[in-house]
Structures are given as structure tokens and as C-alpha cells.
Amino acid sequence: MDTFQLDSRFKPAGDQPEAIRQMVEGLEAGLSHQTLLGVTGSGKTFSIANVIAQVQRPTLVLAPNKTLAAQLYGEFKTFFPHNSVEYFVSYYDYYQPEAYVPSSDTYIEKDSSINDHIEQMRLSATKALLERPDAIIVATVSSIYGLGDPASYLKMVLHLDRGDRIDQRELLRRLTSLQYTRNDMDFARATFRVRGDVIDIFPAESDLEAIRVELFDDEVESLSAFDPLTGEVIRKLPRFTFYPKSHYVTPRETLLEAVDQIKAELKERLDYLRNNNKLVEAQRLEQRTRFDLEMILELGYCNGIENYSRYLSGRAPGEPPPTLYDYLPANSLLVIDESHVSVPQVGAMFKGDRSRKETLVEYGFRLPSALDNRPLRFEEWEAVSPQTIFVSATPGPYEAEHAGRVIEQVVRPTGLVDPEIEVRPAMTQVDDLLSQIRQRVAKDERVLVTTLTKRMAEDLTDYLGDHDVRVRYLHSDIDTVERVEIIRDLRAGAFDVLVGINLLREGLDMPEVSLVAILDADKEGFLRSERSLIQTIGRAARNLHGKAILYADNVTGSMQRAIDETERRRAKQIAFNEAHGIVPKGVRKDIKDILEGAVVPGARGKRKGVAKVAEESGRYENELRSPSEISKRIRQLEEKMYQLARDLEFEAAAQLRDEIQTLRERLVNV
């Protein structure tokens, strides 16, 4: 399946058909930059999916954070179920970079925790780009960081066809050079096991399928994909390509060449340090570098091998490092979502990384060539970026300067118009807000309140709670998963009011929110800029009765521009609806649908039993009222749990065990 096939029950509507036509036209005309100025809820992702389906080009979609990347990944998987939709974000759950603090003589060693599932998805993403013309990669700004050189990476692949002649020992040696390890007991990703002439290999980029290679007299007699848990053969294969375990795997001859170059640089640097009477730094550098070289010669890699990436990729000093962009085919397309946030991120990465590494080089912890293990500079990123579409409700100055064409998508397919805006005095903002909340809660609608400081958000939450308002507070200390759960609870009606400081960054759909209250809207600054105000006001744009109240004593320039722009959009939307006889309809979205991709996409790595368990838990609160109902439910779940255990689905069985325990606790309290 080499062509993009868009699968959707919806047809483009509102401003979408014209926006899609203009974007496709611009791409075919060779425009290097275009901007899709799409209001909240106008279906920007659907428009981009239609563009991809029409131009039939591999696409990199850049998102500003993992939460939005995961949401986009889920949406594109739905739109393109028959194509290769991949996810490329930082694979660190925790990352403490190597650093040195001269003032206290403190060396901080690199410490990290790698998420195995995301590492597998990164490898799957590069494999898709190298093998398939129908790849869509959803990535974050981590895509501008150094990655192994694609030419070296491709040299290392192991390609097997049925009927190939290969000695068993040679096959095992090739697998070892890909950094696969032999493990006959624990069969996991990037391992292989040997049973006579049958070799089972678990590809590094796979999550559910392993490959069985059957040899007969040094000939590949059979290749088959099988389930590593049950051993069931899924299908026979005519051929298969095994990719390395890491993007940094390098051919042996390149390694030997690199070691010689590193030794030459080490000698030069040691002479410099000793001539400048930096004896401690010289001894430190020599000891660390020689240890790394020994590891590279013996194992093919070492901890921190990325610091020698200039030599491993054969690049000249100062040349940009190889990144995900080097893996993109020549005819690729780049889509930058929420570009007003994503583009400035790209520019900021290089500077912070550089200052930390310069200190390490100066004090003898790294060779000067380590400075070339870095993210791309902004101008380098511009040079390697293919044709680009910026997507934002509030494009920034960079987009305004570079966009060859600005395409507006203001009219929503649902006919919904932008929220009404009202300015009210800040003097009585809290009391007025309380009365507004009571009106909305009476209609079973939700409210977002944004404040300027953490202290005020906490105080307001306490005040509203004291007045019997069901309220929660969203702040920066809450991690991504919990943040998603809070938004789920708001939509589900577990509480009615969400107070925060920078709520616009969520980018998640909340159709139940009918009122956005912005306190101290006249305090100019980052949180009350024109762009921030428009984004925050947009949170109420998915509700039929959407309204935004700006509490302010003066109307600032930013406020006036935000109000004027929103009114301009409202006028255009209302005129379109009247001209076409459209009656606005409220958005109704399944809560689980919106959040499907909002946590790191791991669902595809689960088997059926696990997925079924999660569906049940949300029903308890509403359905199970009496002790007899709860007891009946416990018996049903116990039967399922024992069946899953018999089927060796222990992860799913454990989840059911936890559900049963929760129900038993409820039974005691009923």
C-alpha cells in the first residue's frame, strides 16, 4: 500500500474546501512557505489530512509538545489507517545532561531513563521513511537533535530473502553487529534466540511481531512473522530487512577510521592543555577519552558515543549534525502545528546546549569535537526544511515574514461562531465571576478561569471551593498524564470550574466549556498578549453558547486587537451561516475519542484483552448504585480475570484485579 488513503465519514465543509484547494495549489506552484490561519475548532488537522491525500507526499508534522504530538498521532492514525503513521519524540522519561559547575567544582554525570516503547517507535519512524513513500511522522522539536548518519545506518542493515545462502555463524555475527543480543531465555526487543537451525529474531523497531528464520544447509529455507508471546505464525514472508538497534550503529571500517581521528584530536588537545599549564584538565581528558576509545574498539559503542558523532558521520568541523530531516525523502512536506510556539522553540535549542558543552570542553571533560553533537541552528533548520505549511490560530512574526500565502480557515464545518466577548470591571471580578459560574453550572456547562499568578489561582480555587463550587486547579507541577486526566474529569462533569495560569497551552478539545473568564486582562505581558488572549478566548469556541469575559479597568492595545480580530471572525462566520442557511450545532465528542492519543501512544502495543479492561472502568460511578449490582459486577469481572490468566494475559488480568479491589471497597461503603 504505497498511496495515501484518507478514511473519514466527513466531507470538507465551511472554509475547508477552499483552504485545501489553495494549499494544494501553493505546493504544486512551488511555494516554500504557506500559513493556514485556522480558528479553534475549524478542523485544521482534517484539512491537512486532505492536503496530504491529494499531493501524495511523505509528511513530517511538527508539534510543540508531547501531549499535542500524541493527540495529532491519534488523529492521523484515524484518518490514514492503511498508511504508515509514526511517532518521533524524545525517548527520555528522565534526562539529566552532563554538566560541570566551575564555581563549586561540581561535575554532574549524564543520567537518563529511556522509554523503551518510544525508542521502538523512533526506530519504526526512520524505518518507515527509508522503506515507504506513504509515511506520516508526527514529531516534536527533538527532531532537530543529532541522529545517526542515514548512510552509515543503511550500510548496516541485514536483508534476507528466501533462498539466500548464509552461514549460521555469519548470520549471528551480523545480528551482533546490529547491537542485537542473544538471549535464549527472555525474548525481548532487539534480541535473538537460536534453536538448532531455527533463529528467532525480535526486530528493534517492532512491538508485536518477531521473525523466524529457518535455515537448511546454509540456505534460508523459510521466513515467517510470529507472535512472540504465543508462538503463533502470523504470515510467511518472501523477504525481510533487519535494522540496527540504535541510530548510532556504525560500520567497523568507519569506527576504526573515527578512532584514529579521535586519537589525533586528543593529542592536539592534550598539547594545548599542558602548554597552558592545565594539567588536571589534561589528565582528566586523557583518561576519559582513552576509556571511551577502548569501549568503541571492543563493543562498537560507548556511553556518550554521540559526543564523537562528527567523526562517526564523517562531517567537517562546524557542519550540521545528521538529524531526522536527513532521513526525509526529497519530495517531503513539513507541517508545523501551533507554529507560533513551535518555531521559536527551534531557535532556542542550540544556545542552551552550546553554553553547557563549552564549559565541559574548557575543563577537560570533553574534546572540542563534542560541540558538534548539537541540535541544528535555526538557519540550518531552515536550510534542511522541505516545503512548509505553518498551522496556527495566531501566527507569529516569523510566519508573517515568510509565508508566501496566508490561507484563512475561519468558518467552522459545524457553523459555530467565535464566542462573544464582554469587558467587565476588574474591581468586582471575583464576585461577578461567582455569579457567572452559578449560571453556567445550572445549565450543566463548564467554566475555565485564567489568572496571572500561582498565588492568585490557589486563593481563587480556595474561595470558590468555600462557596460550594466544584473546582480544580491546574498548575505546572502536574505531569502530562495527570493533566489529561483533569481535563477528562472536567469534561465528564466530575467538577465544573478549572482554574489555571496558562490554560491555552493544552490545545485539547473541550466542547463542554461555555465560559472563559480572563482575570486582570489589562495587565500587559506574555500571558495577556494579543496572541495569548485569542488562544484563551478560543477555548470557548466549541460550545454553542460560548462566551469570554475579560475583567479589566482599561482596554489595552493587546485586548483591543484581540477583540477586533475575534469580532472580524464572528462577522465572517455569521455572514457565511446566513448566506448558506446553516444553523450552528454544538460539538459532541466522545471523551475517550479526544484523549485517545493524548498520552504517549502505547495502545497499539497492547493486545486485545488489555484494551477491553480499560473500557469498563468509566462506567462504575454512573451504573453501579446498589450493593447487589456491585456484587454482580464483581462476579463478572472475576470470571474474566481467571479467563485472562488462563490465556496468559497477565497484564490485563492484573488490571481487572485492581478494578475488583476498587469495587469491593465501594461495596463496603455503600
Swiss-Prot record:
A motif (Beta-hairpin) lies at residues 91-114. Keywords: ATP-binding, Cytoplasm, DNA damage, DNA excision, DNA repair, Excision nuclease, Nucleotide-binding, SOS response. GO terms for cellular component: cytoplasm; excinuclease repair complex. Pfam families: Helicase_C, ResIII, UVR, UvrB, UvrB_inter. It comes from the Bacteria. Its main location: cytoplasm. Residues 429-582 form the Helicase C-terminal domain. InterPro entries: Helicase/UvrB_N, Helicase_ATP-bd, Helicase_C-like, P-loop_NTPase, UVR_dom, UVR_dom_sf, UvrB, UvrB_inter. Residues 631-666 form the UVR domain. The beta-hairpin motif is involved in DNA binding. Belongs to the UvrB family. The UvrABC repair system catalyzes the recognition and processing of DNA lesions. A damage recognition complex composed of 2 UvrA and 2 UvrB subunits scans DNA for abnormalities. Upon binding of the UvrA(2)B(2) complex to a putative damaged site, the DNA wraps around one UvrB monomer. DNA wrap is dependent on ATP binding by UvrB and probably causes local melting of the DNA helix, facilitating insertion of UvrB beta-hairpin between the DNA strands. Then UvrB probes one DNA strand for the presence of a lesion. This is UvrABC system protein B. It comes from Pseudomonas aeruginosa (strain ATCC 15692 / DSM 22644 / CIP 104116 / JCM 14847 / LMG 12228 / 1C / PRS 101 / PAO1). The lineage of its organism: Bacteria, Pseudomonadati, Pseudomonadota, Gammaproteobacteria, Pseudomonadales. The gene is uvrB.
